[in-house]
């Protein structure tokens, strides 16, 4: 089955892997992006604003930049950061991140909805990071989100899809792409997310903390592609408490 491109605010992408760039050695970024096969890289505005050794100088040409509003504690701060990012990165894409507690770094859905509505009215392609509440996901759609990005588990935790049940509800009811963000720690977890119907996966910590960063990025690429293909092909039915023979049970030789 031929797949359709990932559509974000009218922009089409073949890759369904979004790569973070927060703590890499700058000299590794180009190789990591190339091994990942990604077309979208996200970064904090402060990393792009550095006058010397800006991350922007190391990201290959043709990559779509997705600046985030990391550090924002409310909608107004997120909007201010997004406007600065538009000037610095020359893009309308923005990943809204609003967290006002530092222990668990959970996104504030109410402020995120407010910021999404404000930024969508200004022509941004808004991709909000959210706690996986299906009601909030619908409200973000109504506010103008181009995609929703529910966390799989605590950011940076590598714990995988701890919020699976709620994410499945979001996927089943979404009219915009659902991108799993935060907590994906292994390629197998990224594959699992794609098998359950996610439109894309964002990973950063799992790649950045690997012994061989470019190779791990490539592993995620293949896992995401495999999970997408499995989803499109139609997964086999799971049977509980009984075996299903894989060979004929009649016509034996006597």
UniProtKB/Swiss-Prot annotation:
Assigned EC number: 2.8.1.10
Subunit and interaction comment: Homotetramer. Forms heterodimers with either ThiH or ThiS.
Biological processes annotated in GO: thiamine diphosphate biosynthetic process
This protein's pathway: Cofactor biosynthesis; thiamine diphosphate biosynthesis
Main function: Catalyzes the rearrangement of 1-deoxy-D-xylulose 5-phosphate (DXP) to produce the thiazole phosphate moiety of thiamine. Sulfur is provided by the thiocarboxylate moiety of the carrier protein ThiS. In vitro, sulfur can be provided by H(2)S.
Catalytic reaction list: [ThiS sulfur-carrier protein]-C-terminal-Gly-aminoethanethioate + 2-iminoacetate + 1-deoxy-D-xylulose 5-phosphate = [ThiS sulfur-carrier protein]-C-terminal Gly-Gly + 2-[(2R,5Z)-2-carboxy-4-methylthiazol-5(2H)-ylidene]ethyl phosphate + 2 H2O + H(+)
One CC-aspect GO term: cytoplasm
One MF annotation (Gene Ontology) recorded for this entry: thiazole synthase activity
InterPro entries: Aldolase_TIM, Thiazole_synthase_ThiG, ThiG
Domain of life, source organism: Bacteria
Active site, per annotation: 95
Protein's name in the database: Thiazole synthase
Family that this chain belongs to: Belongs to the ThiG family.
UniProt keywords, alphabetically: Cytoplasm, Schiff base, Thiamine biosynthesis, Transferase
Subcellular location: Cytoplasm
Enzyme class, broadest EC rank: transferase
Pfam family, one: ThiG
Binding site for 1-deoxy-D-xylulose 5-phosphate: 156, 182-183, 204-205
């Amino acid at each position: 089955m031929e797949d359709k491109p990932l559509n974000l605010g009218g922009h089409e992408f073949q890759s369904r892997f979004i790569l973070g760039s927060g703590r890499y050695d700058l000299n590794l970024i180009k190789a990591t992006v190339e091994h990942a096969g990604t077309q979208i890289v996200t970064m904090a505005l402060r990393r792009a604003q550095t006058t010397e050794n800006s991350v922007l100088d190391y990201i290959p040409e043709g990559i779509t930049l997705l600046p985030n509003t990391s550090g924002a504690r409310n909608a107004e701060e997120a909007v201010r950061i997004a406007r600065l990012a538009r000037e610095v990165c020359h893009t309308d894409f923005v990943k809204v991140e609003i967290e006002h507690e530092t222990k668990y770094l959970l996104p504030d859905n109410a402020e995120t909805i407010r910021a999404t509505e404000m930024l969508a009215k200004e022509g941004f392609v808004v991709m909000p990071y959210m706690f996986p509440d299906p009601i909030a996901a619908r409200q973000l759609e109504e506010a103008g989100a181009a995609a929703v990005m529910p966390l799989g588990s605590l950011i940076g935790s590598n714990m995988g899809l701890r919020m699976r049940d709620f994410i499945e509800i979001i996927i089943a009811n979404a009219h915009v792409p659902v991108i799993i963000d935060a907590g994906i720690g292994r390629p197998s977890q990224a594959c699992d997310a794609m098998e359950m119907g996610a439109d894309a996966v964002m990973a950063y910590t799992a790649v950045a903390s690997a012994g061989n960063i470019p190779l791990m990025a490539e592993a995620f690429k293949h896992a995401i592609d495999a999970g997408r293909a499995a989803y499109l092909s139609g997964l086999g039915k799971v049977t509980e408490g009984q075996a299903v023979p894989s060979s004929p049970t009649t016509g034996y030789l006597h």
